From Swiss-Prot:
Component of the PAF1 complex, which consists of CDC73, PAF1, LEO1, CTR9, RTF1 and SKIC8. The PAF1 complex interacts with PHF5A. Interacts with TCEA1, SUPT5H and CTNNB1. Interacts with SETD5. The keyword rRNA-binding does not apply. The modification Phosphotyrosine is found at Y607. InterPro entries: Leo1 (IPR007149). This is RNA polymerase-associated protein LEO1. Pfam families: Leo1. The modification N-acetylalanine is found at A2. It comes from Mus musculus (Mouse).
């Protein structure tokens, strides 16, 4: 270990002196790259000034931390470019050898971060940096470190490398272009490292590398051993108090760095998870995969701010401390939940099978002679079966008024004896018991069957049953005992429409219809007297209206006639014309006198041929009669009613004549 300290100590001091001389030029070039880099350098310088007032500066102990961090990040970027060209064997060798100085710089950079955090905690500034500030600081540090590590080259190469690093952040194509420049520097650094480190030290580093890869995390490489060596070299120079402060500051540093990582960096997340305590099997698998095939994501993860692996292992423990059991087994039982003797909740206990309860019972087996063929029969409403044997002593006839219902609630036809299948026991001549029935099934030559029940004949139809759902059971107390399974069913229909069963069925249907029908229609035996009465009343009313109409018309005609013949000689003939006219004059009194003596004679002479030779009085009378007849003919509606109206008119005329005579007598 002493040789390693001498080697690494001389290298660190030489690099610190060289980087101090070029820090001013590099900081100016970094400020031109962006405002974020200037802010980050300004914050680091402020923190260094505050740290100098409280305790001896870290620059005196370890040199310029910012320069070492820049070198470490630049070496990380070199690793990225080297691993992109991992197809050639020379690049793989340069990767392995270049990781040794870069890991030392990474460890020094992590200690620089710890010192900055320690100074920030001792000051009154309690606020943490946001994720954006952290990213800007990391970006500015990367640019600064890239420029400082390349100070041994010419100024043109420094500017070209700084531009290459900017293009690495923009796109992956720029990173591939800068890989050639990085390889030249890596070869230079490899030659210096080979000169300083002896073969014995390399063998010792390889042994320590194996031990650390088994204990810490799956991505262990030569970088880890070099970090550990650099830690061993720097530890004698640091006091115990500073170690305690660094170990205390490493805890928030780790948590802050974990918070700054984005979700897209899957490899970095896997590293952090392995540091926190992933399964040991997963770590071994990742180690084999990453040692065999180095990927770009691993190179990208190297550019992140490295963590102090030793401090992390001291704080959180190694991978061996993590149990490989599942989460469900390690969960403590919920408080208040009942726990069994083994410490497991009762819900997780396996349910014990409940023992079966068996009761042995002896039941006598009933053997019945069911015959060869079994048929399932659903009896129609016109058939019924009497299961008990027929006994004339206990036989009860059916009543007409009562309705007999079957087991399905249907009304059965009341055929009494004709539709009931019965059986009885009788003795033959020898005294043996014989079972007889009033029904039998006959099978004909064509395969059809018929049921003969007394004098009735029913057609029997056979059909198969679908499924084994119909069984024959017998009762054994409260239980049932299966006997057979039905495969075929039988249906019965009346043989003809002349049978008594068919007549009963039709009558029963008619009875049902008659019960529901409330109105009965009877044939008409004659005319309805009420209708005749109403018709006669209507006719009588029409006659009365016609008579009233005729009377009014006759009255009008008489009034018109009297107005035409009114004159002084007509009304008072004796006063004016007694001497002049004599018998030829027409007067009202003369007319009345003629009506008194010979009304009938006047009526007979109206149509006589002697009317032309008569006097003027006869002409006047004939004219009056003709007018009356014309008026009567116009008022009649039918030929039959004309005669009746004429008779009534004559009668009424007579009445008016009589009234006129009475008026004359009064005069």
């Amino acid at each position: 270990m002493a040789d390693m300290e001498d080697l690494f100590g001389s290298e660190a001091e030489s690099e610190a002196e060289r980087k101090d001389s070029e820090s001013e030029s590099d900081s100016d070039s970094d400020q031109d790259n962006g405002a974020s880099g200037s802010n980050a350098s300004g914050s680091e310088s402020d923190q260094d000034d505050r740290g100098d007032s409280g305790q001896p500066s870290n620059k005196e102990l370890f040199g310029d931390d910012s320069e070492e961090e820049g070198a470490s990040h630049h070496s990380g970027s070199d690793n990225h470019s080297e691993r992109s060209d991992n197809r050639s064997e020379a690049s793989e060798r340069s990767d392995h050898e270049d990781n040794e100085p870069s890991d030392e710089d990474q460890h020094s950079g992590s200690e620089a971060h710890n010192d900055d955090d320690d100074e920030g905690h001792r000051s009154d500034e309690g606020s943490r940096h946001s994720e954006a500030e952290g990213s800007e600081k990391a970006q500015s540090d990367d640019e600064k470190w890239d420029g400082e590590d390349k100070s041994d080259q010419s100024d043109d190469e420094k500017l070209q490398n700084s531009d290459d690093e900017d293009r690495e952040q923009g796109s992956d194509e720029d990173k591939l272009q800068n890989s050639d420049d990085d390889e030249e520097k890596m070869q230079n650094t490899d030659d210096e490292d080979r000169a300083q480190i002896s073969d014995d030290d390399r063998q010792q580093l390889s042994e320590e590398e194996k031990g650390n890869s088994d204990d810490e995390h799956p991505v262990a490489s030569d970088n880890d051993e070099e970090k550990q060596n650099s830690d061993d070299e720097d530890q004698p120079q640091v006091s115990d108090e500073e170690k305690m402060q660094n170990s205390d500051d490493e805890r928030p540093q780790v948590s802050d760095e974990d918070g700054r990582r984005s979700d897209g960096e899957e490899e970095q997340d896997q590293k952090s998870e392995s540091a926190r305590g992933s399964d040991s099997e997963d770590e071994v698998l990742r180690l084999k995969r990453k040692n065999a095939i180095p990927s770009d994501s691993e190179a990208d993860s190297d550019t992140e701010v490295p963590k102090d692996n030793n401090g992390t292992m001291d704080l959180f423990g190694g991978a061996d401390d993590i149990s490989s059991g599942s989460d469900g087994e390690d969960k403590p039982p919920t408080p208040g939940q009942p726990v069994d003797e083994n410490g497991l909740p009762q819900d997780q206990q396996e349910e014990e099978p409940i023992p079966e309860t068996r009761i042995e019972v002896e039941i006598p087996k009933v053997n019945t002679d069911l015959g060869n063929d079994l048929y399932f029969v659903k009896l129609p409403n016109f058939l019924s079966v009497e299961p008990r044997p027929f006994d004339p002593q206990y036989y009860e006839d059916e009543f007409e008024d009562e309705e007999m219902l079957d087991e399905e609630g249907r009304t059965r036809l009341k055929l009494k004896v004709e539709n009931t299948i019965r059986w009885r026991i009788r003795r033959d001549e020898e005294g043996n018991e014989i079972k007889e029935s009033n029904a039998r099934i006959v099978k004909w030559s064509d395969g059809s069957m018929s049921l003969h029940l007394g004098n009735e004949v029913f057609d029997v139809y056979k059909a198969p049953l679908q499924g084994d759902h119909n069984h024959l059971f017998i009762r054994q107390g409260t239980g049932l005992q299966g006997q057979a399974v039905f495969k075929t069913k039988l249906t019965f229909r009346p043989h003809s429409t002349d049978s008594a069963t068919h007549r009963k069925m039709t009558l029963s249907l008619a009875d049902r219809c008659s019960k529901t029908q409330k109105i009965r229609i009877l044939p008409m035996a004659g005319r309805d007297p009420e209708c005749q009465r109403t018709e006669m009343i209507k006719k009588e009313e029409e006659r009365l209206r016609a008579s009233i109409r005729r009377e009014s018309q006759q009255r009008r005609m008489r009034e018109k006639q009297h107005q035409r013949g009114l004159s002084a000689s007509y009304l008072e003939p004796d006063r004016y014309d007694e001497e002049e006219e004599g018998e030829e004059s027409v007067s009202l009194a003369a007319i009345k006198n003629r009506y008194k003596g010979g009304i009938r004679e006047e009526r007979a002479r109206i149509y006589s041929s002697d009317s032309d030779e008569g006097s003027e009085e006869d002409k006047a009378q004939r004219l009056l009669k003709a007018k009356k007849l014309n008026s009567d003919e116009e008022g009649e509606s039918s030929g039959k009613r004309k005669a009746e109206d004429d008779d009534k008119a004559n009668k009424k005329h007579k009445k008016y004549v009589i009234s006129d005579e009475e008026e004359e007598e009064d005069d």
